[in-house]
Amino acid sequence: MTTIEAVRNRILILCGERGITINRLATLSALPPSSIKNILYGKSENPKLITIKMICDGLDITLADFFDTVEFNTLEQELK
């Protein structure tokens, strides 16, 4: 799994747990829906940390909560 795949999966899992749509997440995060959709559908391969922070704020979680998962903790090194 790549880092961007882990980010996409985490957003989808968090939305699913809360029963919210991508559009609702965008509203809660004060982001345009296109920003989140670009991450989820592969148009944004390197989302900015501030965007992820705003998503976390909208979900009322910390960045640490967002990244503290098995997927992120077991990512392979990006440098090759």
Positions of predicted regions on the chain:
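Residues within the helices of the helix-turn-helix
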Residues: 12, 23, 53
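The alpha-helix within a helix-turn-helix
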Residues: 15, 26, 56
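Short, charged recognition helix plus adjacent turn
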Residues: 38, 67-80
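Short, basic-rich loop-to-helix N-cap that marks the start of a DNA-contacting helix
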Residues: 43-57
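Residues in the recognition helix of alpha-helical DNA-binding motifs
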Residues: 14, 28, 39, 69
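Short alpha-helical DNA-recognition segment
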Residues: 19-38
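A short, Lys/Arg-rich alpha-helix, primarily the initiator
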Residues: 1-20
